[in-house]
């Protein structure tokens, strides 16, 4: 490796670890939501409390092990649902970045969901436990050098531990719920279903929120923190979510894995989101079919989010007359939209698009804004209704203070002010519980100072 390459790798080591903590779980839409199978009941997937009362999951069609001879159905009827998913990625940097090379990354996800009313008569009560285990290497940290990351399974270190553990109480006829416990914000905030097929982390939790500020960062994959979350669904077309979450200290990002953050002095994050579904409000002709009974559910969502941390954070490079860092509020906002654009008549096959934009104060962390857009087609071919194909792009821009800090640490000017990633992928459902997903990414200006990189690989996912 050249001298410049070694310097770049040393410089971006800490920075990359910060952004890697923004990886999300398909096992991790943020590593947690994509682990679920198509018909799995998941009260943590962002729906209202009433959504958790849907039909019994069809394990024969969505898992390798099926119904366990009827045992899974009996457990479900008693109020217990268990799911185990293993995902394995192999990605390789073929050109550009830090250096050529690849890495395997594995992720095991065990989810246990409990219905309080069925188990102990706790009306409106539920519990959720998720354990995760990471194995393998780090293709972005060691080979690509992207600020945003390239794979939503990659974590700074390999560990096994608790990721989610919360209790929930629903009330107001299931139109509201209060959730308390270990809670990652990427399970419900900044979520677009049509982007969940992609492997790039920024199509889960966006880069400007996932990046750590000068003092602390968010509770997201792979490190969670304790929180209290209130959700209100006054109407099927509207929802509002508000959460107060303990921050993850920035001084431990290099060692943070899938474990719990209890450290004091890291501040707290307040985040809120309001969303609206034009389709559920009856504003769109979302069911172009002659059948009276149509189970097709179009993707349709508009949302606005706001977040801020307390206390105030030190600015990255700005100082006062005495040479002490200036303090500023670490905050941001985002808007998102996704919508089914076209549906194959008389089917569940559809083309959807998403668009997301978010910005920050630009003083207390590297990025000041990012945006992403893409298309995904569920059931692109006749007879392949469970497959999904997609193409998407995301761009993250570094603010003036972020660029100044990176340039000073590197000892030379940066080659760009922004990093852009484009991804194409095809997720093929080969059998019940078995999916294979090839992917190609092109990373422009990785790390704002490295040659453009091309990344290719494949994901294997097994729902057991």
What are these regions (language model features)?
Residues 258, 273-276, 305-327, 343, ...:
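Outer membrane beta-barrel transmembrane domains
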Residues 66-82, 115-127, 172-175, 237, ...:
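Short loop/turn motifs that connect adjacent beta-strands in outer-membrane beta-barrel proteins
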Residues 87-91, 132-134, 183-185, 245-247, ...:
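Outer-membrane beta-barrel pore domains and translocons
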Residues 54-58, 72-95, 127-131, 137, ...:
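Transmembrane beta-strand segments of Gram-negative outer membrane beta-barrel proteins
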Residues 211-344, 348-351, 357-360, 377:
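Signature for the C-terminal beta-barrel architecture of outer-membrane proteins
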Residues 101-249, 276, 365-405:
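Outer membrane beta-barrel
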Residues 27-89, 93, 99, 117-121:
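N-terminal periplasmic/intermembrane-space "pro-region" immediately following the signal or transit peptide
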Residues 452-464:
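Outer-membrane beta-barrel "beta-signal"
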